[in-house]
Curated annotation (Swiss-Prot):
The lineage of its organism: Eukaryota, Metazoa, Ecdysozoa, Arthropoda, Hexapoda. Expressed by the venom gland. It holds the Pfam family CAP. It is found in: Secreted. Keywords: Allergen, Disulfide bond, Secreted. Residues 45-189 form the SCP domain. Disulfide bonds join 4-17, 8-101, 26-94, 170-187. GO terms for cellular component: extracellular region. May have an ancestral function in the promotion of ovum fertilization by sperm. This is Venom allergen 5. It comes from the Eukaryota. It comes from Vespula flavopilosa.
Length: 204
C-alpha cells in the first residue's frame, strides 16, 4: 500500500494506510449502506460547480456582510476517484470529524464533513449535506482574508469556493446509532484550500 509512504504535512499515518480497506469499522453502530451511486457523485459535483459559478457571477447575496464579490478565477471542479476512495475509507470509520493525513501523491488535500440524523427511518440526500456547507456563507465577511473569518463557522464554505482547488471526491455512509438514522458525508479536495492570509479567489 503506497499510502503508507505518503508523508503528510501535518504528520500522522495516512488514512488509507491506517485502515487499509473499504470495510466499515463502526463498532456498535449498524451500517445500512456505504458508497455513492454514479448519479449521487454527479449530483454532488454539479452542486459544487453550480455554487462556485453563483459566487463567480456575484449572485450570492448572503454574508456578514453580504453580498459576496464576484470571482475572476473560479473554475469548475472535476471528480477525482482517488480523492473519493480516501474519503470513503475515512467515512467508513463512522467517526465524525477530520482525519489527519489524507494527502495524495500530487497534492495536499482539504476536507469537508457533514452529518445529519433523523429518528424517522430516512436519510438526507447528499446534496442537502453539501448545501449545509454553502449556508455557512451567511457568516463570511468578504472584506477579510480567510484567516480573518471564524474558521469553525465558515471553513466548509471557504473550501468549497477556494479558487485554486481543482478536484473533489467524496464518500458517504448511512448507519443507525441508537434510534438515530445518520448520514455522514466526507468530501476531499485537491489541491487543498483554506490557507492562512490567502484570498479565497481573485475578485473582479
Amino acid at each position: 500500500n503506497n499510502y503508507c509512504k505518503i508523508k503528510c504535512l501535518k504528520g500522522g499515518v495516512h488514512t488509507a494506510c491506517k485502515y487499509g480497506s473499504l470495510k466499515p469499522n463502526c463498532g456498535n453502530k449498524v451500517v445500512v449502506s456505504y458508497g455513492l451511486t454514479k448519479q449521487e457523485k454527479q449530483d454532488i459535483l454539479k452542486e459544487h460547480n453550480d455554487f462556485r459559478q453563483k459566487i463567480a457571477r456575484g449572485l450570492e447575496t448572503r454574508g456578514n456582510p453580504g453580498p459576496q464579490p464576484p470571482a475572476k478565477n473560479m473554475k469548475n471542479l472535476v471528480w477525482n476517484d482517488e480523492l473519493a476512495y480516501v474519503a470513503q475509507v475515512w467515512a467508513n470509520q463512522c467517526q465524525y470529524g477530520h482525519d489527519t493525513c489524507r494527502d495524495i501523491a500530487k497534492y495536499q488535500v482539504g476536507q469537508n464533513v457533514a452529518l445529519t440524523g433523523s429518528t424517522a427511518a430516512k436519510y438526507d440526500d447528499p446534496v442537502k449535506l453539501v448545501k449545509m456547507w454553502e449556508d455557512e456563507v451567511k457568516d463570511y465577511n468578504p472584506k477579510k482574508k480567510f484567516s480573518g473569518n471564524n474558521f469553525l463557522k465558515t471553513g466548509h464554505y471557504t473550501q468549497m469556493v477556494w479558487a485554486n482547488t481543482k478536484e473533489v471526491g467524496c464518500g458517504s455512509i448511512k448507519f443507525i446509532q441508537e434510534k438515530w438514522h445518520k448520514h455522514y458525508l466526507v468530501c476531499n479536495y485537491g489541491p487543498s484550500g483554506n490557507f492562512q492570509n490567502e484570498e479565497l479567489y481573485q475578485t473582479k
